């Protein structure tokens, strides 16, 4: 079977939380402090390294945030991370600094084999970070971003789709701290 569109490396880099973090860092896109973990002991070590709660648990290779969540203490961290490790196709979770309350903005991006790329649509989640996108009220186009911030996120989305070598469409989500 021939895979059309994205190659497997692109899919891995987009879906593996640790690889994606490194991709973003490699093209100077800011990312939250985070540690990839494959065991509960690594999760606890990551929490100690980050040093504060709440923490976000993000399983790799799952749909709809399955197995993830926000932990406000060590007990919740162990419980959520255990489920995340089970749900992840590769047994990996990313333990991340919480950005609860930040705004979530999404960009639908298309790119063809000739490297023509366009932002098809922008969306803004009316609910703050912490409410899963699938359960949030979303409006299109964005309503509250300044043009400067929109252009910055637009450029970042285009930079990312090109770096990941995605051919076709993708959804890029950003967290924006309200000033």
What are these regions (language model features)?
Residues 1-172, 176-179:
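N-terminal beta-alpha lobe that positions the nucleotide/phosphoryl donor
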């Amino acid at each position: 079977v021939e895979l059309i569109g994205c190659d497997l490396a692109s899919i891995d880099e987009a879906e593996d939380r640790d690889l994606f973090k490194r991709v973003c860092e490699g093209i100077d896109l800011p990312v939250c402090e985070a540690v990839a973990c494959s065991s509960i002991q690594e999760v606890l070590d990551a929490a100690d390294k980050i040093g504060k709660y709440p923490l976000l648990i993000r399983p790799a290779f799952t749909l709809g945030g399955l197995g993830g969540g926000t932990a406000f203490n060590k007990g919740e961290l162990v419980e959520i991370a255990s489920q995340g490790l089970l749900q992840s196709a590769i047994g990996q979770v990313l333990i991340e600094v919480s950005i609860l309350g930040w705004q979530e903005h999404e960009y639908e991006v298309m790119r063809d084999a000739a490297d023509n790329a366009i932002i098809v649509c922008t969306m803004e989640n009316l609910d703050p970070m912490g409410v899963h996108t699938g359960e949030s009220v979303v409006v299109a186009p964005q309503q509250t971003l300044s043009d400067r911030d929109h252009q910055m996120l637009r450029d970042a989305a285009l930079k990312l789709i090109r770096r990941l070598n995605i051919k076709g469409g993708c959804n890029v989500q950003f967290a924006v701290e309200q000033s």
